[in-house]
């Protein structure tokens, strides 16, 4: 679907959870690569965020991207997004979708809403909790993991709980959007096979380092 967005000039709005910091995190690299992909198509990109300013953020003006600070829980966002009249709105992580998606839908009902997961936060948290619980059980029994560290973590992760409140929130955000970008095939399979998210609402979009220009 992203390839299909290369025809004609569109107004693209990215609503970030934080400012893009490609030198600080993989998430920052992924966001900058996505922005550069839309710029390579010739689209106009505006980056909006409610996050505080950061000395580590990339210089968006330098790559031709307008940036704006927005307020949470404020109707001024509705007025601004309506004026921008975007064709596409990208939400950086499910938390941002929860905050702004309904406002975008009200102000710009024809805009395509895309969720950029970065990764599945609920999956990462479920695996972390499972490994921690497994380690606690070993300590309580005064045993140690007999398998190598990687195998130990993999075995513990098999016991992960995928039906947490966090998972419900994240899946709800995915289902509300027209399209969700997924960076790993494992996550894609989990979404389609376990959560039964329609494949037409998902797009496998791994990190593309060639599109990162810092």
Q: What spans do the regions from the language model cover?
A:
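Conserved small/polar residues in nucleotide/adenosyl-binding loops
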Residues: 212-214
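Membrane-proximal helix-turn-helix segments that form the acceptor-binding/catalytic region
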Residues: 139-179
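Active-site proximal beta-strand in glycosyltransferases
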Residues: 108-125, 133-152
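Helix-loop-beta element that forms the nucleotide-linked donor phosphate-binding surface
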Residues: 176-182, 188-209
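Conserved nucleotide-sugar phosphate-binding/catalytic loop shared by glycosyltransferases and other
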Residues: 55-76
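N-terminal subdomain of nucleotide-sugar transferases
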Residues: 2-57
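Short N-terminal targeting/anchoring amphipathic segment
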Residues: 81-99, 114
